[in-house]
A protein has these predicted regions:
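Structural signature of the two symmetry-related core transmembrane helices
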Residues: 99-114
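Helix-loop boundary and gating motifs at the non-cytosolic
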Residues: 35-74
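Juxtamembrane intracellular "pre-TM" segments in multi-pass secondary transporters
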Residues: 8-41, 221-227
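Helix-to-loop junctions at the C-terminal end of transmembrane segments
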Residues: 84-97, 182
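A late C-terminal transmembrane helix in Major Facilitator Superfamily
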Residues: 156-183
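A membrane-interface helix-boundary motif in multi-pass transporters
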Residues: 180-198
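C-terminal membrane-cytosol helix-exit motif in multi-pass small-molecule transporters
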Residues: 1-14, 201-209
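Intracellular juxtamembrane helix-capping segments at the cytosolic ends
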Residues: 138-151
Length: 227
């Protein structure tokens, strides 16, 4: 089929009718909409949380005397927790995006901060961080929805490119945050700093619409999702 389409008489490739969209031209529109900024911030903090978990948990495990295999086992267990995401999705759909996002950030904030307080009991601290991975997975499910549901349909292509910049920003913010924390605190302090950022996002998520993402039935029986 591929060769027929490429070598046949049909037009497999057509000339573009207009210039390619320029995401930079939409930065002004992005900064003018607080809902987009909040949604993008949620994505950055979620990615930062995974960076802290994946990079610093194995290092901390070795320094805490848990051995050099615990880090790898923790990553494997965190990956296995992805099988719980269908249950998380069902839980979220029965409530609202706002409630799910706030629950994710609050749970991550508490568990990461608790891991710092339990640093002298490494196994308990590790269990707290693994619980934090569950909340990060919940944010993987719902954390991007506030941004995507706030974007106008006519701007989705350009704003998708703006949204994807969260990966690059978190890749800069995460090591910079760790560097600042390690100047004045032990390695476990990185988890506390991440928990503090999650707490800030929990407060910010309180400004989302209470019924964001909640399905409602119209007079004609149609199901509409609140944006």
């Amino acid at each position: 089929v591929f060769w027929v389409m490429r070598l046949g008489n049909g037009k497999a490739i057509a000339r573009a009718r207009r210039p390619a969209p320029n995401p930079m031209a939409y930065l002004g529109r992005f900064f003018a909409q607080p809902r987009l900024i909040s949604g993008w911030t949620f994505a950055v903090m979620r990615s930062t949380g995974w960076y802290v978990f994946v990079v610093f948990l194995p290092i901390w495990a070795v320094k805490a005397g848990l051995g050099d295999k615990i880090g790898g086992l923790s990553m494997s267990l965190a990956s296995a927790l992805m099988f719980t995401t269908p249950l998380m999705l069902r839980w979220m759909q029965a409530r609202s995006v706002r409630r799910a996002v706030r629950a994710g950030f609050l749970g991550a904030a508490v568990t990461f901060a608790l891991a710092t307080l339990l640093a002298d009991a490494p196994w308990l601290a590790l269990a707290s961080l693994m619980a934090g991975a569950l909340f990060l997975l919940l944010l993987d499910i719902c954390g991007g929805l506030p941004f995507l549901m706030a974007v106008k349909p006519s701007e989705r292509t350009e704003m998708a490119a703006v949204y994807s910049s969260y990966r690059d920003v978190s890749g800069i913010v995460s090591p910079a945050l760790a560097w600042l924390v390690l100047l004045a605190a032990p390695l476990s302090g990185v988890f506390a700093a991440a928990g503090l950022l999650f707490g800030g996002c929990w407060v910010l998520a309180g400004r989302l619409h209470p019924r964001l993402g909640v399905a409602r039935v119209t007079a004609r029986g149609a199901v509409v999702v609140k944006e």
